[in-house]
Amino acid sequence: METDCSPMELTNNTESEEDSDYRDFEEADVKDMRLEAEAVVNDVLFAVSNMFVSKTLPCAEDVAYINVETRERGRYCVELTDSGLRVVAYDFDQTDDSLQNPYHETVYSLLDTLSPAYREVFGNALLQRLEALKRDSQS
Protein backbone atom coordinates (compact mmCIF):
# COMPACT_ATOMS: atom_id res chain seq x y z
CA MET A 1 0.00 0.00 0.00
CA GLU A 2 1.35 3.46 -0.86
CA THR A 3 1.64 6.11 1.83
CA ASP A 4 2.04 9.86 1.68
CA CYS A 5 4.67 10.03 4.42
CA SER A 6 8.25 8.95 4.79
CA PRO A 7 9.36 6.29 7.27
CA MET A 8 10.82 9.06 9.48
CA GLU A 9 7.40 10.68 9.78
CA LEU A 10 5.96 7.39 10.97
CA THR A 11 8.39 7.16 13.88
CA ASN A 12 7.49 10.69 15.02
CA ASN A 13 3.78 9.89 15.16
CA THR A 14 2.33 10.99 18.51
CA GLU A 15 -1.08 9.29 18.43
CA SER A 16 -2.06 7.29 21.48
CA GLU A 17 -2.05 3.50 21.44
CA GLU A 18 -5.85 3.46 21.77
CA ASP A 19 -6.24 5.69 18.69
CA SER A 20 -3.89 3.42 16.77
CA ASP A 21 -5.84 0.29 17.74
CA TYR A 22 -9.11 1.92 16.69
CA ARG A 23 -7.68 3.02 13.33
CA ASP A 24 -6.30 -0.47 12.66
CA PHE A 25 -9.71 -1.97 13.44
CA GLU A 26 -11.44 0.43 11.06
CA GLU A 27 -8.97 -0.27 8.24
CA ALA A 28 -9.26 -4.03 8.73
CA ASP A 29 -13.06 -3.72 8.56
CA VAL A 30 -13.01 -2.18 5.07
CA LYS A 31 -13.50 -4.77 2.34
CA ASP A 32 -12.07 -4.51 -1.11
CA MET A 33 -14.85 -6.04 -3.19
CA ARG A 34 -12.45 -6.83 -6.04
CA LEU A 35 -10.57 -9.18 -3.70
CA GLU A 36 -13.85 -10.66 -2.50
CA ALA A 37 -14.94 -11.14 -6.11
CA GLU A 38 -11.66 -12.89 -7.00
CA ALA A 39 -12.17 -15.24 -4.06
CA VAL A 40 -15.72 -16.01 -5.23
CA VAL A 41 -14.45 -16.79 -8.74
CA ASN A 42 -11.67 -19.05 -7.45
CA ASP A 43 -14.12 -20.92 -5.25
CA VAL A 44 -16.58 -22.04 -7.95
CA LEU A 45 -14.80 -21.68 -11.29
CA PHE A 46 -14.55 -25.47 -11.59
CA ALA A 47 -18.35 -25.75 -11.72
CA VAL A 48 -19.14 -23.19 -14.45
CA SER A 49 -17.98 -22.71 -18.05
CA ASN A 50 -16.42 -19.31 -17.46
CA MET A 51 -16.26 -16.81 -14.61
CA PHE A 52 -14.15 -13.69 -14.12
CA VAL A 53 -14.20 -10.29 -12.45
CA SER A 54 -15.27 -7.59 -14.90
CA LYS A 55 -12.49 -5.31 -16.06
CA THR A 56 -15.00 -3.03 -17.81
CA LEU A 57 -17.42 -2.20 -15.00
CA PRO A 58 -16.01 -0.23 -12.07
CA CYS A 59 -14.97 -2.01 -8.89
CA ALA A 60 -14.85 -0.17 -5.58
CA GLU A 61 -14.64 -0.89 -1.87
CA ASP A 62 -18.38 -1.56 -1.85
CA VAL A 63 -19.13 -3.17 -5.23
CA ALA A 64 -17.62 -5.49 -7.83
CA TYR A 65 -19.03 -7.19 -10.90
CA ILE A 66 -18.49 -10.80 -11.91
CA ASN A 67 -19.21 -12.24 -15.35
CA VAL A 68 -20.52 -15.81 -15.26
CA GLU A 69 -21.20 -18.28 -18.05
CA THR A 70 -22.98 -21.38 -16.83
CA ARG A 71 -22.51 -24.83 -18.34
CA GLU A 72 -25.88 -24.30 -20.04
CA ARG A 73 -24.30 -21.28 -21.81
CA GLY A 74 -26.34 -18.71 -19.91
CA ARG A 75 -24.39 -15.46 -19.55
CA TYR A 76 -24.81 -13.19 -16.54
CA CYS A 77 -23.30 -10.14 -14.98
CA VAL A 78 -23.46 -10.45 -11.20
CA GLU A 79 -23.12 -7.60 -8.72
CA LEU A 80 -21.29 -8.32 -5.45
CA THR A 81 -21.95 -6.01 -2.50
CA ASP A 82 -22.26 -6.33 1.27
CA SER A 83 -25.91 -7.27 0.61
CA GLY A 84 -24.81 -10.34 -1.35
CA LEU A 85 -24.80 -11.32 -5.01
CA ARG A 86 -27.48 -10.67 -7.61
CA VAL A 87 -27.85 -10.83 -11.38
CA VAL A 88 -27.81 -7.31 -12.84
CA ALA A 89 -27.75 -8.27 -16.55
CA TYR A 90 -28.06 -11.23 -18.86
CA ASP A 91 -24.76 -10.61 -20.65
CA PHE A 92 -21.17 -9.88 -19.69
CA ASP A 93 -20.11 -6.40 -18.56
CA GLN A 94 -23.64 -4.97 -18.53
CA THR A 95 -26.04 -3.63 -15.93
CA ASP A 96 -29.78 -3.25 -16.38
CA ASP A 97 -31.35 -0.95 -13.79
CA SER A 98 -34.81 -2.29 -14.62
CA LEU A 99 -33.89 -5.73 -13.24
CA GLN A 100 -34.92 -6.26 -9.63
CA ASN A 101 -33.42 -9.69 -8.98
CA PRO A 102 -33.09 -10.80 -5.37
CA TYR A 103 -29.79 -10.89 -3.51
CA HIS A 104 -28.26 -14.23 -2.58
CA GLU A 105 -26.09 -14.55 0.51
CA THR A 106 -23.67 -16.93 -1.19
CA VAL A 107 -22.41 -17.67 -4.69
CA TYR A 108 -23.57 -21.26 -4.15
CA SER A 109 -27.16 -20.14 -3.65
CA LEU A 110 -27.02 -17.87 -6.70
CA LEU A 111 -25.57 -20.54 -8.99
CA ASP A 112 -27.97 -23.12 -7.61
CA THR A 113 -30.86 -21.02 -8.96
CA LEU A 114 -29.17 -20.29 -12.31
CA SER A 115 -27.67 -23.62 -13.32
CA PRO A 116 -28.85 -27.21 -12.83
CA ALA A 117 -25.47 -28.33 -14.23
CA TYR A 118 -23.74 -26.35 -11.47
CA ARG A 119 -25.74 -28.29 -8.87
CA GLU A 120 -24.66 -31.58 -10.44
CA VAL A 121 -20.97 -30.67 -10.78
CA PHE A 122 -20.81 -29.17 -7.29
CA GLY A 123 -22.61 -32.17 -5.80
CA ASN A 124 -20.25 -34.60 -7.54
CA ALA A 125 -17.20 -32.66 -6.35
CA LEU A 126 -18.54 -32.70 -2.79
CA LEU A 127 -19.17 -36.43 -2.99
CA GLN A 128 -15.63 -37.06 -4.26
CA ARG A 129 -14.17 -35.05 -1.38
CA LEU A 130 -16.24 -36.93 1.16
CA GLU A 131 -15.18 -40.27 -0.33
CA ALA A 132 -11.53 -39.17 -0.21
CA LEU A 133 -11.91 -38.20 3.45
CA LYS A 134 -13.48 -41.55 4.19
CA ARG A 135 -10.60 -43.39 2.46
CA ASP A 136 -8.04 -41.30 4.36
CA SER A 137 -9.68 -42.00 7.71
CA GLN A 138 -9.76 -45.76 7.00
CA SER A 139 -6.08 -45.99 6.12
Curated annotation (Swiss-Prot):
Q: Where in the cell is it found?
A: Cytoplasm
Keywords carried by this UniProt record: Cytoplasm
Q: Which SUPFAM superfamilies match?
A: Hypothetical protein c14orf129, hspc210 (SSF103107)
GO BP, one example?
regulation of canonical Wnt signaling pathway
State the source organism's domain of life: Eukaryota
InterPro entries for the chain: GSKIP (IPR037395), GSKIP_dom (IPR007967), GSKIP_dom_sf (IPR023231)
Write out the ranges of the annotated region (Disordered): 1-23
Gene3D superfamilies listed in its UniProt record? Hypothetical protein (hspc210)
Molecular functions per Gene Ontology: kinase regulator activity; protein kinase A binding
Q: Which family does it belong to?
A: Belongs to the GSKIP family.
Q: What protein is this chain from?
A: GSK3-beta interaction protein
Source organism of this protein record: Gallus gallus
